[in-house]
Structures are given as structure tokens and as C-alpha cells.
Regions:
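C-terminal nucleotide
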Residues: 1-110, 120-150
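Conserved glycine-rich beta-strand-loop-beta hairpin in the small C-terminal domain of fold type I
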Residues: 117
Length: 200
């Protein structure tokens, strides 16, 4: 399971200013700093997202937490310099570096446009998740938890194909119901039995 914790830092930030400053890099970057911002929010971000998807699908929770830390480092290095008045984020960084929080989590990062608004963590387990929520609430940072359980995968499925398909009569006089052609989500015509198997 993924034991997430989200919290409001209860500090101030100006989202409109952040977005206005960061949007200066689009659609065409004019300075080196703007080019780095585009790279960070583009190809580097895409790479981190793909690795995060891989971590989740393979159950590598600790590595997912490290990716959160990496994403925050990339943001701080390449994006934050384009809006220093709002993205120095002292409370965010103090919270991310809190020794008590580091004991309870695999990683953490800011949320959305960043700044001293909200924060998210990946707790090590359910007990750490509860302790982290209590700790953040006690420090005037309202927190809530979200646990995502692993998806149950189907290893075996029974697909009944017996019977005459009376609701499809008279077509079933010429073609068994399990071989009826259907158009799948990719706009390919396949026998209905194949579509059922692919869905399993």
C-alpha cells in the first residue's frame, strides 16, 4: 500500500504571482533560466513521472519516496529561481528537513505551484502515517491521510461460452455467440471471446 499524507503548511503564498512569473518562460524561453525551467517542467518531469509509474507498478515504495525528493530538488534548482519572492518557501523546506518527519517518511515534496502552501509525504507504513498526521496537526499544519491499496489482479478467469445465445437468434444459427465480431476500444474488429480475455 501507498501511505500518503497531505498537509496545509498554514503559511502565505501568492499563487497568482508564482504562475505569472513561471509563465514568462512560455511559449518561448528567452533566458537561460527560462530554458532550464522548460526543461525541468518538460523532459525532466516526464522522466520522473515515468519512473514513478514504474515504481508504483512494481511495488517499489521506498524508490517512489526518493523520486519525490528528487522532484523537489529539480524544482528548487531549475524552477524556483524564476520566482524567488514566492518559491524560497522557508516553511516548506523546514518541514521537509524536519528530523522527526524524515524518520516517518520515504520522501516528500511541495504541491502544485509549490511555495508555502501545501505539502505531501509518502509515509513508511500505516503506523508512521498516523504518527505523521498527529505530528503535523500538533504543529498547526492540518493534515489528512490517503492510503492506496494495491490493485487486485486476476490470474484465472472462467468465461462461459456454452449455450445457444437465444437472445442473438437468428444470427447464432450461422456463428457461435463467442465468435461474434465486436469493435474494441482500439477500433479493431475482434471476436467477443478475445475481447473478454483481453479485459481479464
Amino acid at each position: 500500500p501507498l501511505h500518503w499524507v497531505f498537509a496545509n503548511l498554514n503559511a502565505s503564498k501568492d499563487t497568482i504571482r508564482i504562475l505569472a512569473d513561471l509563465n514568462k518562460a512560455y511559449p518561448f524561453a528567452e533566458t537561460d533560466a527560462e530554458k532550464l525551467e522548460q526543461k525541468a517542467l518538460g523532459e525532466i518531469n516526464q522522466d520522473i513521472i515515468q519512473r514513478a509509474i514504474d515504481c508504483m507498478s512494481e511495488g517499489r515504495v521506498e524508490d517512489l519516496g526518493k523520486l519525490m525528493n528528487e522532484a523537489q530538488e529539480v524544482f528548487d534548482k531549475y524552477v524556483a529561481p524564476n520566482c524567488p519572492s514566492q518559491l524560497k518557501s522557508p516553511k516548506l523546506h523546514a518541514t521537509l528537513a524536519d528530523p522527526k518527519i524524515l524518520e516517518l517518511t520515504y520522501g516528500g515534496k511541495g504541491v502544485g505551484s509549490q511555495g508555502d502552501g501545501s505539502i505531501q509525504f509518502l509515509a513508511k507504513n500505516e503506523e508512521c502515517q498516523k504518527a505523521l498526521v498527529n505530528y503535523l496537526n500538533a504543529n498547526n499544519m492540518p493534515a489528512y491521510k490517503l492510503t492506496i491499496q494495491p490493485k487486485h489482479t486476476i490470474r484465472k478467469a472462467i468465461i462461459p461460452v456454452a449455450g445457444f445465445g437465444t437472445r442473438l437468434y437468428p444470427e447464432t444459427r450461422f456463428l457461435k455467440k463467442d465468435f461474434f465480431p465486436v469493435v474494441d476500444k482500439d477500433n479493431q474488429v475482434k471476436p467477443v471471446i478475445l475481447v473478454l480475455i483481453e479485459e481479464c
